[in-house]
Design a protein with these regions (language model features):
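Gly/Ser-rich "nucleophile elbow"/oxyanion-hole loop immediately N-terminal to the catalytic nucleophile
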Residues: 84-85, 159-180, 196
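Short beta-strand/loop motif that positions the catalytic acidic residue
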Residues: 386-388
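Catalytic-loop region of hydrolases
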Residues: 23-128, 363-364, 448, 454-456
Length: 456
């Protein structure tokens, strides 16, 4: 457990002098732990200075904040610092973005100011929660989109160097956090570089790793073919990716079929999520598709099943070319000998299902690539907190179960704490993020393991 805190500095760190200072002439190479990127210290930084209303978070009605937008390598980054900086730095790693989206830029209209309009942007909401509590906050847009785990780990880790330049001082403590794919990035950095971080926070993170993420969407693709044959022209395990317009048409047809006759989709939902019974502490497993327990009627219930299907299918159908390119032209998925089972299915029904699911062979080079980018070990030296929704259709419970088992196997359970929230969806609210962050900070500073609030 990292307890390298010292008393907080009493004076706020002033960065105004840095805004007019060139650190060197020409391009620099920023390097940290083998990661590197070019940096122009004389670039035209966009500097925002303003007041943030922190009264909703128990702070002052007008907190002075300085924000800086810069570029490192091929990616934009943001650093925010409150005038009453407490000395700690929080890094944020964003989640997956479809490969047809532009890389290297944030997905909102810059500048991200300090008025009410910032609440319309997820990053603005998180920034407000963090900065209003005295922390500095930094985030990278990543050089690339798609399954950019490698780029995300590099660009987020290098924020350690860049943020220090803008803050004007070495942070007392540094916390790395992220959502979904970004949660995997945050935990991966915590595993590999515990000397750089004091704690890590993952929300809905892919903590089972990228091989498990591929298994999810690739199993879903094969099972979709068994229940809805012929709707997709390309064969499982091959491209091309669909255009956004083509996927929208596909999604509309799936939704219409499901509402007209939900029996097929309900039957598909009763398939046991592949391999989940081996990870479930109770040995039961989870359904392939979740329904929203809070759905008010049958139409909404079927709609939640449709969303549970289309989420993973969008990851596959819109990004299959990106996955193939990163995996040296191959897939890391193999179901040639996998036996699909169902809840309350007869042996004959399961045999019929297995006969209808297309079979795919894994490419060893693709397996190797995704093992390195990234397969978490669960071996921890610093506190790690994870927020997970029990009915997450994008990052199912198997990821949490897998990571908890890895932490136990490596003797790291004392460094890992999961906050399980009973709900449907792939999100944590900004308030939940802040609650978990403050609990993580207390854990690091005092050694007190978090006790999570009971959710309705």
């Amino acid at each position: 457990m990292s307890l390298r805190h010292c008393p907080r500095p009493l004076a706020a760190i002033l960065i105004a002098t840095l805004l007019t200072t060139a650190w060197s002439s020409g391009l620099e190479t920023i390097e940290l732990d083998g990661y590197r990127a070019t940096f122009d210290p004389n670039q035209d930084f966009l500097v925002l200075e303003g007041e943030l209303d922190c009264s909703p978070f128990g702070g002052a009605a007008a907190v002075q904040v300085t924000g800086t937008l810069g570029r490192l390598g091929e990616s934009d980054y943001l650093v925010y610092q409150p005038a009453d900086w407490n000395g700690d730095l929080v890094l944020w790693a964003h989640g997956f973005r479809h490969s047809f989206m532009p890389g290297g830029t944030f997905l909102f209209a810059l500048p991200l100011g300090f008025g009410p309009e910032a609440d319309e942007v997820e990053l603005g909401q998180l920034r407000n929660q963090v900065v209003c509590r005295g922390f500095a906050f930094a985030a990278s847009a990543y050089e690339d989109t798609g399954l950019a785990v490698a780029e995300g780990m590099r660009d987020t880790h290098l924020l350690n160097v860049i943020a220090r330049r803008h803050l004007g001082a070495e942070p007392v403590a540094t916390y790395v956090s992220g959502h979904s794919m970004g949660g995997l990035i945050a935990v991966g950095l915590a595993e590999q570089y515990p000397h750089r971080y004091d704690g890590a926070l993952s929300t809905c993170g892919l903590l089972g790793g990228m091989l498990a993420a591929h298994d999810h969407v690739d199993h879903m693709r094969g099972l979709f073919e068994a229940f809805f044959p012929g709707m997709i022209e390309s064969a499982p395990g091959s491209g091309p990716s669909l255009t956004p317009e083509a996927f929208d048409a596909f999604a509309s047809e799936v939704g219409a079929r499901a509402q007209e006759d939900p029996a097929v989709l309900r039957r598909m939902a009763s398939v046991r999520f592949p391999g989940s019974e081996r990870l479930d502490p109770e040995g039961v497993g989870i359904p392939l598709l979740w329904t929203d327990p809070a759905a008010p009627d049958a139409t909404a219930e079927v709609g939640s099943l449709v969303n549970s299907l289309l989420g993973p299918m969008s990851l596959y159908l819109l990004n299959v070319d990106d996955g193939l390119a990163r995996g040296a032209g191959g897939f890391p998925f193999d179901n040639r000998h996998f036996a699909y089972t169902g809840f309350d299915w007869t042996a004959e029904e399961e045999a019929d299902l297995n006969a209808r699911v297309p079979r795919v062979e894994a490419d060893p080079w693709a397996v190797r690539y995704w093992t390195f980018h990234y397969e978490p070990s669960g071996d921890l030296e610093i506190p790690v907190v994870s927020i997970m929704a029990t009915h997450d259709p994008i990052v199912p419970l198997v990821h949490e179960w897998s990571y908890a088992q890895n932490a136990a196997r490596t003797g790291s359970s004392e460094h890992y704490s999961a906050w399980m929230i009973p709900r449907y969806g792939h999100f944590a609210t900004p308030q939940e993020y802040a609650t978990a962050l403050l609990a993580l900070v207390e854990w690091v500073e005092t050694g007190t393991r978090p006790t999570w609030p009971t959710m309705p």
